[in-house]
UniProtKB/Swiss-Prot annotation:
Subcellular location, record wording: Cytoplasm, Cytosol; Secreted
Protein's name according to its UniProt entry: Interleukin-18
Source organism of the structure: Equus caballus
Assembly description: Forms a ternary complex with ligand-binding receptor subunit IL18R1 and signaling receptor subunit IL18RAP at the plasma membrane. Mature IL18 first binds to IL18R1 forming a low affinity binary complex, which then interacts with IL18RAP to form a high affinity ternary complex that signals inside the cell. Interacts with cargo receptor TMED10; the interaction mediates the translocation from the cytoplasm into the ERGIC (endoplasmic reticulum-Golgi intermediate compartment) and thereby secretion.
Propeptide position ranges: 1-36
Amino acid sequence: MAAGPVEDNCISLVEMKFIDNTLYFVAENDENLESDYFGRLEPKLSIIRNLNDQVLFINQGNQPVFEDMPDSDCTDNAPQTVFIIYMYKDSLTRGLAVTISVKCEKTSTLSCKNKIISFKEMSPPENINDEGNDIIFFQRSVPGHDDKIQFESSLYKGYFLACEKENDLFKLILKEKDENGDKSVMFTVQNQN
């Protein structure tokens, strides 16, 4: 039995035009086209650790820090150690788009506004109509490391969540990735559900 061509598997282009040295294609019928946006999917509850096996948690000042913590303490302190990672459908292919939230008394969502990491008191929205946003990160696996993950900012290309020692604290920061095997941008994500 021979395979036949699949019908209606393309967009008919009826017109092309140059505007300011950019070629634009005009679709005959654009009712099925989507604009660039992120659409929220189901969440995962996760514990995030740095490469020193320290657990990410929210301290009393609502700041994300890493600390040595046995699994039993993670369970006892679940509101501060279990993060809600919402996955988003992305209209572009750039990695798994996610937000990272925590629910202590209220829901707070991780933001990298002005390249500063903080938690905003807000629930992640259902849809985000931007191509880049301060609360969206691209979760990707690290080549050569089966169980390691990195999170790139959708707003600041080339900037990643990282662990950095500051005084006696290990803090979560946003930094430009060093191409020489920077391990500070690698994490393990242990799903709880």
